[in-house]
Amino acid sequence: MEKLRESLHEAPIIDKDGYSYLVHPLSNGVPMLEPELLREVVVGVTRAADLDVDKIVAPEAMGIHIATALSLQTDIPLVVIRKRSYGLDDEVPLHKTTGYSESEMFINDIEAGDDLLIVDDLLSTGGTMAAICEALDDIGADISDIVVVFRKQGESALDDTDYDVTSLLDISVDQDGVTIHD
């Protein structure tokens, strides 16, 4: 994870209303995402994840590129949990609350009994992931594994659940930069 570690130390930190916000290619799309970094991350996820699944699931938006590359590498189909409704017959809405917003997301193409790997870029407050897991459970799908690239230190909405999340790196962010916790 050498390139991933280097990229964190090079990433800008901006202040958003008193919140130290990491701007990183994997979690924000800027600065540009170098293929070497994406490749390293996908290899890391491949090694960390249970790949004996029916589908890879990723929330829109920043988990998509990681999950797409993983799907291409593993030949496992990809389902994107979207921010927009298309009104399709099998669409399942979910409500998510994060540390800074509330919104709806929409699930299609997941059925009871599907074994799933959830992949995302960042776990911060856990609000998005908790809402996704609850909705997938309600459908009757089996969450085999959850892997994120970065997990921010601190309380998470997943703390009081039975869901285990594997992260490639645990981090904390403040105005001075990113600290990697090994």
UniProtKB/Swiss-Prot annotation:
It comes from the Archaea. Its EC number is 2.4.2.-. InterPro entries: HGPRTase-like, PRibTrfase_dom, PRTase-like, Pur/Pyrimidine_PRTase. GO terms for molecular function: transferase activity. Keywords: Purine salvage, Transferase. GO terms for biological process: purine ribonucleoside salvage. HAMAP family: Hypx_phosphoribosyltr. NCBIfam families: HPT_Archaea, PRK02304.1-4. May catalyze a purine salvage reaction, the substrate is unknown. Belongs to the purine/pyrimidine phosphoribosyltransferase family. Archaeal HPRT subfamily. This is HGPRTase-like protein 1. It comes from Haloarcula marismortui (strain ATCC 43049 / DSM 3752 / JCM 8966 / VKM B-1809) (Halobacterium marismortui).
